[in-house]
């Protein structure tokens, strides 16, 4: 039994050993697997050759074989490419392989052959190839007419950056062929007399219409031969590919497509995009370049794996994403948003969101004001929500915004839903910042009130007006109220010198602000304080002061923003109680402008008191103008200069003094004068008037009959005034100056004498030789009175008339007033008798005037009794009509006296002066038109005898006074 087992084992081992020995002999020999090429198909447009071959001697089921392929051009000995191709070959299987030529296949004949070698793990490595197959000729050439030039490839499509070889097949009658790429010349390689190759590397995209290649032969026709290269932009991979849902019914997939590769002439359409979902196996072509909508079915999965492929005629590009549907939720915007204001500071907001079962959204609420987010809050929402905004400003426009996103897996916020609203107005919350300016005019206070506009947060609405209540502290029950319409920021009041309290408040549609108080004392506007000079800093002033009292509750600093213009634009700054310095800055401050500051102290009673004045410049500048100068006291050796001052507020700096420049030919400077050289190299003398209050200077030690030039210019810490044109002055000579000193006083004396004589000539004439003396105006009468001689006064009873004259009154003439004041209107004859007749005695009689004459007593005493009356130019009744009653006596006296003066004094020694009583009737300036019945009567005036020594004097005095 044991022997049998051993025998079987030995037999098995011998059989295995025999099989291995047989296999070693077979595998050790090289396998002769010579390929056989069956067909070669060409695709000229792609410059591709597709080979098909088999291995006739292949008897195995499957082996991995390496094929070596050799390609020659134009002749078999001109090998242009050798390469290996490894593949698994099955029994009686046809092998396929594709080769792309670097030149168009139409340009040359190609030859292809193949050999093989087993490369399989079942066999030991082979050291030799099989035999070569027979050459397979690949010929796509076309015949070329003698006068034709063929260019290949024709209308080739390729990507930007590719390399391409252009083949020129030249007819036998053509030579010296030149080509251009667009307008640039290109050169090629001459393979033979009828074949040339032009290699273009890294071609660029020029335009969608393609790139032109044009060729022309020198000896040929004028025809141009060419082709077009359609260069496409490189197809890009889609970017930012993502998918999301807004309603769990559709998936919206978006991507960035990149550059469009469309070419003209339908050579290439725009790339198209395909979506493939691997779990469901669905494939859909998008109708858009950058988006696609994927429908979600009820039985769709929650996880998706998408591949997006972009494809054109030249290549494909793909990207993939995978996601869970609940993680890609992009909610729609909230809807039904409402806002209701609650008072002036609150607003209530409500909204709804799209609902899906128990799906929770997180909503973000924002409140914006003037484009800025002032409040933000998050709210969890299922279907609807609300929110209350508080601490809002009255009369302010707000914008409430809300958006939502998935609460569990945040992906994207929804679009904002916005709603604008405005809160209602409220009464102003702050009192006005008020200031005043007080001045005294004509015994009254002229008060100018100023206030600053409230900030928007303080006004709480549109300010409509300002209320002003003026309360007289002397009589509190008396108050006046004024209203100033907005947007005015001030007003003027005229008040007496009593103390007043002025209450000011701002009003809007909702109410009034707290009152601001201005207190005026009786001495407001009369404060006199010290004014000091300060130095400015950059863009402002550092102002400090000494406290006056210990009970100050604050200070106010005010100034004019435009001190050199009529518009002051008063500004002020409030300072706390324990602060005695502040920095005033303003963009309105300018160099070279003086600013005046006043510091006021506020008391507990709201009284303000001026404690200090300060003035200064942010930057002093040199004076821009020189003062006007006049010359005085010009002598041969000196003259005086006097210049004007100008307003300090218009100075560009603090005037420290004046420089006086003097030019002369001698160039010799007086003592205290400095010899200096100006920037224009001119040499002159300079004198420094270092007292700015001094406005005069006497220049001495000059030469007579010499020309001098001078200039007066002010200077500040920044420099002196402009170097303007000098004023010329010539000193007179000594003799002419002395002569002038003599002639001028004499001329002045003569001139004054002439004026005095002319002024007194009329007086001398009246005193020395009057035309008609007036005894009533003469001083002789006063002499007579002073003597009080009663015999010089003539009584009526002593007067015997020499002539009685009856004055007729024409019919219809005006009624005359007589001495008694009674009227007589009866007609009288044209020639009245000297005495009344009997016939007329019974009837009405005219009033009789009896003239009494003043006579010269000396003439009477001498015994000369002749009576020579002077001619009367005007009768009494004529004078009565032409002159008022109170003037009648003077008229008669003047005329009569004139007639006497004209008569020679030798012819008469007795001079009679008529003294006719003036009529008196009520109104002595007018005659009565309806007089009462006349009463007959006559009246004598007293007559007086004048001594002869006084007659002439009386006449002269009368003439002067008349």
Curated annotation (Swiss-Prot):
Full protein name: Oncostatin-M-specific receptor subunit beta
Region (Disordered): 818-840
Disulphide connectivity of cysteines: 243-253
Gene symbol of the encoding locus: Osmr
Glycosylated position list: 219, 324, 492, 578, 723
CC per GO annotation: apical plasma membrane; external side of plasma membrane; oncostatin-M receptor complex; receptor complex
Record keyword DNA-binding present: no
Subcellular localization, as worded in the UniProt entry: Membrane
UniProt keywords, alphabetically: Disulfide bond, Glycoprotein, Membrane, Receptor, Repeat, Signal, Transmembrane, Transmembrane helix
UniProt family annotation: Belongs to the type I cytokine receptor family. Type 2 subfamily.
UniProt motif Box 1 motif: location: 768-776
UniProt cross-references to SMART domains, sorted A to Z: FN3 (SM00060)
InterPro entries assigned to the protein according to its UniProt record, in alphabetical order: FN3_dom, FN3_sf, Hematopoietin_rcpt_Gp130_CS, Ig-like_fold, LIF-R-like_Ig-like, LIFR_D2, Type1_Cytokine_Rcpt_Type2
Span of the annotated motif WSXWS motif: 413-417
Limits of the Fibronectin type-III domain: 237-332, 333-426, 428-527, 528-621, 623-734
Function: Associates with IL31RA to form the IL31 receptor. Binds IL31 and activates STAT1, STAT3 and STAT5. Capable of transducing OSM-specific signaling events. The OSM/OSM-R system is pivotal in the differentiation of oval cells into hepatocytes, thereby promoting liver regeneration.
Cytoplasmic topological intervals: 760-962
Domain notes: The WSXWS motif appears to be necessary for proper protein folding and thereby efficient intracellular transport and cell-surface receptor binding.
Annotated signal peptide: 1-28
Residue ranges, Extracellular side: 29-738
Molecular function per GO: ciliary neurotrophic factor receptor binding; cytokine binding; cytokine receptor activity; growth factor binding; oncostatin-M receptor activity
